[in-house]
């Protein structure tokens, strides 16, 4: 055979190679290329919108923390934000991260699915909410669309209020008793001291210690329960004690760090609350109207600091919850059937199935189990004293600048995110 008999081989065209690939590979290649270019474009032109969007949300949240009703809206908004954080964290672990954006995945869950940045007023996904099918699977009529359109301007406002009210109600069911006992001990102790009731001198301190203990026991549970209620969107989930307690055990080390963070960032807030007691030296010559105006501006700035502090600890709490759920599933502490339906649905849609792994019994297992038990008990003791410090700063602040009722009945980072301590006589 000579070289003339060998047919000349031409290089394959790129289009021919593409056609030779399986259909699934072609679609995946094209999709990845589009998503890659889309993500680059999003990073280039959308970041100013994201920046200004967050500036608006933080400013609005700070202003709302100045009023009691506004603090309910802030609570609901942060709950919705935590819900989006947790779902986004699981989405990043799934294959859907390579196939589209987080917004696309949430849109596939329905018009009421979580969002990365909740709105304060307008309804999320307006077009989808307006054109969704009715309960019978039929296209909505014109009248129904008009009725739905009436809710668009204020739906998020109502949602924030409803979720916030439910969250605060559940929180006070556990923490309110300790707050009431501490308030009683403080008021009774001072009244008894003024009236020289020496026979009842121990009632105030002893009831105060009881109130502190009851509040601390509640606070060991409350932060994780708040996130669980926020993520599931179900107020009854707050009292899913068995599941929440296993989440705490699964991530106990970082949960202690979370408690320390809450206590740490509450210190500047306590200082800001107490500081006006020392303003008297340079406001003596001011009129009541001038003092009122100054305090309003001061507490507005404090409210902004409170809102940012609230975002910080709830961001960390959402991250802890996100990993804790997967950990309890991976260790077999909770079966998939025991999950809240909302969590189970999300994990199913994301194709996330942690396989339970059990440690083999033996000497190594016994040593590890014993060391973990000692370590866990140490963390519980540390957690107790961290929350004790959280309460102790309130007593110190009360001695320096007395605030009746609200100082003991409301801890802004955990209960009502409200920061307005203007004296009532000055307001009137």
Task: Give short role names for the model-derived ranges.
Residues 273-304, 399-408:
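Extracellular/periplasmic helix-loop-helix junctions in multi-pass membrane proteins
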Residues 2-212, 216-224, 228-263, 267-274, ...:
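Helix-coil boundary and N-terminal low-complexity module in membrane systems
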């Amino acid at each position: 055979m000579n070289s003339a008999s060998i047919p000349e081989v031409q290089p394959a065209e790129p289009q021919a190679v593409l056609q030779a690939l399986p259909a699934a590979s072609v679609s995946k290649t094209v999709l990845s290329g589009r998503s890659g270019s889309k993500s680059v474009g999003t990073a280039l032109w959308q970041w100013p919108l994201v920046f200004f969007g967050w500036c608006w949300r933080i400013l609005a949240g700070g202003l709302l923390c100045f009023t009691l009703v506004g603090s309910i809206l802030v609570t609901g908004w942060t709950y919705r934000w935590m819900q989006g954080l947790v779902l986004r964290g699981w989405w990043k672990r799934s294959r859907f991260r390579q196939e589209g954006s987080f917004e696309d995945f949430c849109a596939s869950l329905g018009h009421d699915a979580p969002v990365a940045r909740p709105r304060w007023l307008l309804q999320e996904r307006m077009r989808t909410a307006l054109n969704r099918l009715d309960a019978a699977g039929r296209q909505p009529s014109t009248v129904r669309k008009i009725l739905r359109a009436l809710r668009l301007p204020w739906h998020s406002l109502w949602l924030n209020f409803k979720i916030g009210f439910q969250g605060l109600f559940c929180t006070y069911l556990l923490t309110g008793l300790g707050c009431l006992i501490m308030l009683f001990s403080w008021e009774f102790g001072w009244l008894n001291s003024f009236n020289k009731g020496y026979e009842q001198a121990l009632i105030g301190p002893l009831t105060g210690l009881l109130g502190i203990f009851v509040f601390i026991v509640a606070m060991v549970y409350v932060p994780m329960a708040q996130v669980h209620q926020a993520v599931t969107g179900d107020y009854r989930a707050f009292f899913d004690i068995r599941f929440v307690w296993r989440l705490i055990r699964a991530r106990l080390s970082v949960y202690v760090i979370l408690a320390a963070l809450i206590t740490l960032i509450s210190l500047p807030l306590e200082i800001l609350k107490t500081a006006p007691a020392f303003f008297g030296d340079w406001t003596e010559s001011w009129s009541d109207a001038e003092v009122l105006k100054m305090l309003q501006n001061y507490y507005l700035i404090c409210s902004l600091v409170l809102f940012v502090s609230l975002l910080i600890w709830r961001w960390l709490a959402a991250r802890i919850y996100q990993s804790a759920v997967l950990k309890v599933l991976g260790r077999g502490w909770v079966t998939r059937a025991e999950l809240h339906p909302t969590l189970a649905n999300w994990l199913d849609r994301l194709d996330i199935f942690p396989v339970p792994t059990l440690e083999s019994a033996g000497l190594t297992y016994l040593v590890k189990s014993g060391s973990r038990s000692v370590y866990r008990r140490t963390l519980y003791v540390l957690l107790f004293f961290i929350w004790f410090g959280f309460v102790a700063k309130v007593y110190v602040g009360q001695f320096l600048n007395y605030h009746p009722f609200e100082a003991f009945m409301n801890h802004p980072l955990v209960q009502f995110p409200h920061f307005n301590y203007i004296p009532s006589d000055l307001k009137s």
